Amino acid sequence: MASWLQIPKNSPFSLANIPFGIISSAKITSPVAAVAVGDYALNLSIFASSGGFSQLPVIQPHLGVFSQPTLNAFAALGRPVHRQVREYIQSVFRADTPFPQILKDNSTLQKEALLPLSEVTNHLPMHIGDYTDFYAGLNHAYNVGVLFRGPENALQPNYKHLPVGYHGRASSVVTSGTPIRRPNGQILANPAANPKVPTFSPCKRLDIELELAAFVSKSNELGKPVSIDEAEDHIFGVVLMNDWSARDIQAWEYVPLGPFNAKNFATTITPWVVLLDALEPFRTAGLEPGNRESLLPYLREKRELNAYDIPLEVEITNAGGKPTLISRTNAKNLLYSFPQMLAHHTITGCNMNTGDLLGSGTISGKENQTQGSLLEQTNGKNPLKLADGSERLFLEDGDTVVLRGMAGTEGNYVGFGDCVGTILPALKLEF
């Protein structure tokens, strides 16, 4: 899809994408809605107030949503509106645009509304009321299960019957680039000791988790589940996510109710929300068909293809060092889709709200260096080597982690942008 705007061929934000986000800048002090196009952000607030949407009647009554500090109001308008807005913006930027007067030949509006991405500050795209993290990465679940329970009992009996999940902490979800403070907590230094007595210490086994996450658009009433056939229309779009994890804190605390402090200190997401329509060309088979007979009817999708073919990668750069690519995997390594997660989450009548976030769970392949966590790669025993020769079992202070995901071909990539976090030392606490 050719554009009159110069878009780098390797940009994750080609015209095939058009992801939505929230930005501010030196000139725009209040956060507003935007879309990313190549190396630019289009300020949708200025675009809307300057007649940019004059050829799109469906959005006329709702132009105020683009001046809000979150995308919640826009997301709540529903998928048909999202689709028309995205397609309209694509048509405005096309080389053969039917509306050249809107932006292509409007140098004044270009100067006001098109901002270099290097000059904008990204904010969380949505107000996140609740955050649920699932465990749909079958290979990750198996790999970790083998480490703790052996191959015969790696997966719990419920795993292939329902999307396992837990309620995370919405308040500590941060946007890419936010520094991550190493957590302090209770750690069992010697698991073989008897009696087992913890110590208080900075986390020594700080890890990453490579995930996708989906934002809810349409809410449902309390007591009324979202059916599997309707669930996709309740999803706004997808981001890349790093669910930072304190493995040693988790090992001591997680029985019997699961992770708590080990997961609540930070979760990083990319700031640009990629709409489901942009991902649709990459729909593919997941680890098992979405319509498999082994699922109970409320989870059984009508179609077999229930995943997206999106290459993913993990990179670590130590302080003063060079980047090291430690993992390549693919988003199709999931057992459940986001519609299945949403249908399961609401089957009890749980009401979801616009802006709620659903994490996929860690995405890993079966081969070495396709894992989405350090725990799987090193088991805390077998270090991986960085480019400068240093070794890692888990993350050290000063390490910068970058997650990336991008599908498609040169000139038409659909990607999320970088998901970045740098580890800061733990606070020194005295009691």
UniProtKB/Swiss-Prot annotation:
Alphabetized InterPro entries for the sequence: Fumarylacetoacetase, Fumarylacetoacetase-like_C, Fumarylacetoacetase_C_sf, Fumarylacetoacetase_N, Fumarylacetoacetase_N_sf
Region (Disordered): 362-382
GO molecular function: fumarylacetoacetase activity; metal ion binding
Function of the protein: Fumarylacetoacetase; part of the L-tyrosine degradation gene cluster that mediates the biosynthesis of the brownish pigment pyomelanin as an alternative melanin. The 4-hydroxyphenylpyruvate dioxygenase hppD catalyzes the conversion of 4-hydroxyphenylpyruvate to homogentisic acid (HGA). The protein hmgX is crucial for this conversion and thus, probably functions as an accessory factor to mediate specific activity of hppD. The homogentisate 1,2-dioxygenase hmgA is then involved in the cleavage of the aromatic ring of HGA and its conversion to 4-maleylacetoacetate.
Residues given in the record as Mg(2+) binding sites: 243, 263, 267
Superkingdom per UniProt: Eukaryota
One GO BP: homogentisate catabolic process
Catalytic activity entry: 4-fumarylacetoacetate + H2O = acetoacetate + fumarate + H(+)
Polar residues bias spans: 362-381
Cofactor: Ca(2+); Mg(2+)
Positions with a binding annotation for Ca(2+): 133, 209, 211, 243
Pathway: Amino-acid degradation; L-phenylalanine degradation; acetoacetate and fumarate from L-phenylalanine: step 6/6
Entry keyword set: Calcium, Hydrolase, Magnesium, Metal-binding, Phenylalanine catabolism, Tyrosine catabolism
Upper classification of the organism: Eukaryota, Fungi, Dikarya, Ascomycota, Pezizomycotina
Protein residues bound to substrate: 135, 149, 250, 254, 362
Transmembrane domains' residue ranges: none
Induction, per UniProt: Expression is positively regulated by the cluster-specific transcription factor hmgR.
Family: Belongs to the FAH family.
Known EC number: 3.7.1.2
Protein name: Fumarylacetoacetase fahA
Catalytic residues in the record: 140
Gene name in the database record: fahA
